[in-house]
Amino acid sequence: MNVVFPGSFDPITSGHMDVLTRAAKMFDHVTMTVMHNARKQGRYLFTLEERLQILRDATSHLPNVSVDSFGGLLVDYMAQEHKGIIIRGLRAVSDYEYELQIAHLNRQIGEVETVFIMAATRWSFVSSSMVREIASYGGDISEMVPRASASALKLKFADVYAEREATRSV
């Protein structure tokens, strides 16, 4: 069975990787789909192309995982790709309430099912926005993201990391 794991992945975190790795064991193939919204274009830290490359690098060790992108309704992508199951990771009850609403809508308008996978407890506090915030101050994000994301974030905030390193050397 082939499934889709959608998200903005700006950037992919260790929590995403945890859910992905477990989904890859449960299903024949997982397509990581970077959803991009033209109305949110200025809000992304990484461009679509950068996010796709980070995902490819982070998932290259998983033979049954591929990377794609789409800029419309997820149910339209699912129909276009002939896929019927969405994978969503959950960190807390608050995620569940939101995701349940979306799952019901996806089922109603696109006849698509959603499978929820609970993130491991150690990743329940990690989000892409928190990782971006920590990285923007030069903080250590190495445990919170795969190596590909950490490298990309350090490049994006190279001046901050260089300044932080310089102050440590003094």
Swiss-Prot record:
Covalent S-S links between cysteines: none
A biological process from GO: coenzyme A biosynthetic process
GO molecular function list: ATP binding; pantetheine-phosphate adenylyltransferase activity
Pathway in which this enzyme or protein is active: Cofactor biosynthesis; coenzyme A biosynthesis; CoA from (R)-pantothenate: step 4/5
Residues that bind ATP: 8-9, 16, 89-91, 99, 123-129
EC nos: 2.7.7.3
Record keywords: ATP-binding, Coenzyme A biosynthesis, Cytoplasm, Magnesium, Nucleotide-binding, Nucleotidyltransferase, Transferase
Compartmental location: Cytoplasm
SUPFAM superfamilies, alphabetized: Nucleotidylyl transferase (SSF52374)
UniProt: substrate binding residues: 8, 40, 74, 88
A Pfam family: CTP_transf_like
Residue(s) at site: Transition state stabilizer: 16
Chief location of this protein within or outside the cell: cytoplasm
Entry cofactors: Mg(2+)
One Gene Ontology cellular component: cytoplasm
Catalyzed reaction equations: (R)-4'-phosphopantetheine + ATP + H(+) = 3'-dephospho-CoA + diphosphate
Subunit structure: Homohexamer.
Family (UniProt): Belongs to the bacterial CoaD family.
Chain's role: Reversibly transfers an adenylyl group from ATP to 4'-phosphopantetheine, yielding dephospho-CoA (dPCoA) and pyrophosphate.
PANTHER family with a match to the protein in the record: PHOSPHOPANTETHEINE ADENYLYLTRANSFERASE (PTHR21342:SF1)
Official protein name in the record: Phosphopantetheine adenylyltransferase
Organism: Deinococcus deserti (strain DSM 17065 / CIP 109153 / LMG 22923 / VCD115)
